[in-house]
Amino acid sequence: MRRILVIFCGCLTLHNGAAIAQESGATMVIEPKAVIESAVNAGDLAFAVAAVGNAGGEIWSYASGHKDADKKRAASSNDIIQIASMTKLVTTIAALQLVERGALELDTPIDAYVPELAGLQVLNGFDANDGPLFEQASRAPTTRELITHTAGYVYESWNSNARRAANLGVTESAFGSGNFLASPLAFQPGTNWEYGISTDWLGALVERRSATRLANYFAKNIFQPLGMDDSHYELPEGKLHRTVTVMARAGDSLVPAPMLQPQAMEAGSMAFYSGGGGLYSTLSDYGRVLQMLLNGGSLNGMTILKPETVDAMFSNHVGDIQPAALTTAMPSISNTADMSFGAPATFGLGLLIHPQGILNGRRSNTGSWAGLFNSYYWVDRESGIYGIFGTQILPFYDAATIATLAQFERAVYSSKVGSKLTRSAK
């Protein structure tokens, strides 16, 4: 892999492709274009797309590279990507809407809503003969614990016991077509933090309590009110040409990843909608979710969440429990990932929270997360901006992508020194 070389000066000038935004009579110049082009031109990334916005909407976007492995279709900022676990924020918003309506309670054990979850077991490991060692769960997780990843559910890609259980046939793999939601817990609810399938169960709760399939709930209560016309579980045939090939690292090369490519599907045809992943979207569409959060839960005269609910999303809901690095158990799927980027972190309602910000520029209590195919976002309410950076590469936490993301963030924040983005919506 060639090293990404980007020289980004603190003194910014206008170049072709720079984005300019007017704020209270001042001119603000954003030029992260060089960061993105450098990574693509060096061959570190085949495709990259990025966007920056504030409470008034998207103010800058740019794409570089190609949508396809044959390099016949140039990248565009309105390309549709698979956002994977960025779906989790949408599912969390849906669940919080039901909390506001009284259909869910954050601290009620979920077997009150899903009786079949009574009597859960915890997988503690294996004996010398590969026999699973179970103990009874003290109780079912709560809705809050599902949202904060303290429920005990994990992913086999970052948990060696869960990976071993899937390999031995003790549980269904989350990467297959089986009933992976029936997996045991990895720890007693509320005692630890580990990223996992909790948000899939949260999506199931949304369906159960709203009596609506998740795709339909999202469309009616989130996508349509926010004007998100390019966000789908089932991609329409007419939009397939706007999608991006998922690539995988193969030594110093990038090759198409098997079985993970975009495909068109008829609306309503999926048997299972994953609350933890599966959406297609554009950065412009997803940015409207982040813009809504910067506006305290409302956009275009539509209230998606109450302001106090949005405030709660950016607050610590795990106490002294520390979100840990995601230690890989499946290197082809993910590298070991430090989503806190070396800074102190906690977890809110659906967001990793940086109480002290991070060195790349995010301010105190910025919320963030990511998607498996190396798409990343952050919402910085103190600065009044959001940012999204996306590729379509495996494994997750790709070194070249993370390096480019860090430089992109520094470019965004350097470009606004001495200026503050307006928080008022248009």
PLM features per residue range, with description:
Residues 19-23:
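Boundary at the C-terminal end of the N-terminal hydrophobic targeting segment
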Residues 115, 120-361:
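Short, surface-exposed loop or secondary-structure junction motifs
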Residues 30-36, 56, 82-110, 118, ...:
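Active-site SXXK
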Residues 1-4:
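Positively charged n-region of N-terminal signal peptides that target proteins for export
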Residues 366, 373-386:
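Short, surface-exposed beta-strand/loop micro-motifs that present aromatic residues
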Residues 6-15:
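Bacterial N-terminal signal peptides
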Residues 25-83, 103-105, 122-126, 398:
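Short, conserved catalytic-motif segment at the N-terminal edge
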